[in-house]
From Swiss-Prot:
It is found in: Cytoplasm. This is Diaminopimelate epimerase. It comes from Natranaerobius thermophilus (strain ATCC BAA-1301 / DSM 18059 / JW/NM-WN-LF). Belongs to the diaminopimelate epimerase family. GO terms for molecular function: diaminopimelate epimerase activity. NCBIfam families: DapF (TIGR00652). Keywords: Amino-acid biosynthesis, Cytoplasm, Isomerase, Lysine biosynthesis. The lineage of its organism: Bacteria, Bacillati, Bacillota, Clostridia, Natranaerobiales. Catalyzes the stereoinversion of LL-2,6-diaminopimelate (L,L-DAP) to meso-diaminopimelate (meso-DAP), a precursor of L-lysine and an essential component of the bacterial peptidoglycan. Pathway: Amino-acid biosynthesis; L-lysine biosynthesis via DAP pathway; DL-2,6-diaminopimelate from LL-2,6-diaminopimelate: step 1/1.
Length: 299
């Protein structure tokens, strides 16, 4: 069985065509960095040609612990970049179905923000980037969802929770999967991130768990972020998380809907359109290598 290894800002994935297996178990084995290939997640994809799905392809993403994610921004960029180069596609635009809806992606070249934001140093900025319409974020407590009473229709902004390191204020946003965004004066030491990440991920407030982002506001268009991903732990980048960060920063008055998000693995440009309220993510995706699995891995 052939596979591709790709990454988006160091958030790495194994891409495989759908072949009807126990994917949660396979993801745990293949993503293991000591006894498997090693990755943050497993992406399974298939063509929608002979289906009733109104998209070109569909994808499912499994985290390294075997859990399934609704959507992954870095993974969909990787898949789009791979499909555009290797499969029969209609130009550089694709519609990819996910469990969080159909996402429209586009391969872009000579990306220019007309001087609005300096993206110098973006990984892959001199090559093709991938633009993804991430659709509208969900902000109401009932939509994310949160385990709260009486205020299910409120915007979940600056909600306090108590932790071993004191009180942190969360702004919750769903950009497919749920995210808890926390604004801090300084980014966390690694030891603190490794302890706080799982505490917030599994907090009773989130019935299905949550991704966690710690954010330092450098300027109105520059946000530095640390990521703790639900089901994967500390990672170098999170695309849906970068989108959630810009939404949270906007509703809290830190930016105006457009910013680049600096993650440990590199930068993403995020635009939350004022007119349509839709989110757009632009960033790189890189092919690492191709490989073939020994059939014994399936038994």
């Amino acid at each position: 069985m052939k596979f591709e290894k790709m990454h988006g800002l160091g958030n790495d994935f194994i891409l495989m065509k759908d072949f009807q297996r126990n994917y949660p178990d396979l993801a745990k084995r293949l993503c293991d960095r000591r006894f498997g290939i090693g990755a943050d997640g497993l992406v399974i994809y298939s063509s929608c040609k002979n289906s009733n799905i109104n998209a070109d392809y569909q994808m499912r993403i499994y985290n390294s612990d075997g859990s399934e994610a609704e959507m992954c921004g870095n993974a969909i960029r990787c898949l789009a970049k791979y499909l555009a180069k290797t499969e029969e596609t209609d130009g550089k635009r694709l519609a990819i179905a996910t469990t969080a809806g159909i996402k429209r992606v586009e391969i872009v070249e000579n990306f220019d923000l007309m001087g609005e934001i300096n993206l110098s140093g973006m990984v892959g900025s001199q090559e093709q980037l991938v633009k993804v319409n991430m659709e509208k974020p969900l902000l109401k407590s009932s939509d994310i969802p949160l385990a709260v009473k009486n205020d299910r229709n409120d915007i979940a902004r600056q909600r306090p929770i108590d932790t071993p390191y004191g009180i942190y204020y969360l702004t919750e946003v769903s950009t497919g999967p749920p995210h808890a965004v926390i604004f801090v004066q300084n980014l966390l030491p690694e030891e603190q991130l490794l302890e706080l990440g799982p505490i917030i991920e599994k907090h009773d407030l989130f019935p299905y768990g949550t991704n966690v982002e710690f954010v330092k506001v450098e300027s109105s268009n520059h946000l530095r972020v640390q990521v703790w991903e639900r089901g994967a732990g500390k990672t170098l980048a999170c695309g849906t998380g970068a989108c959630a960060v810009v939404v949270a920063a906007t509703i809290n008055g830190f930016c105006n809907g457009m910013a680049y998000v600096e993650l440990p693995g590199g930068k993403l440009f995020i635009n939350w359109d004022n007119n349509t309220e839709e989110l757009y993510m632009i960033g790189p995706a890189e092919h690492v290598y191709s490989g073939e699995l020994n059939n014994q891995i399936f038994y």
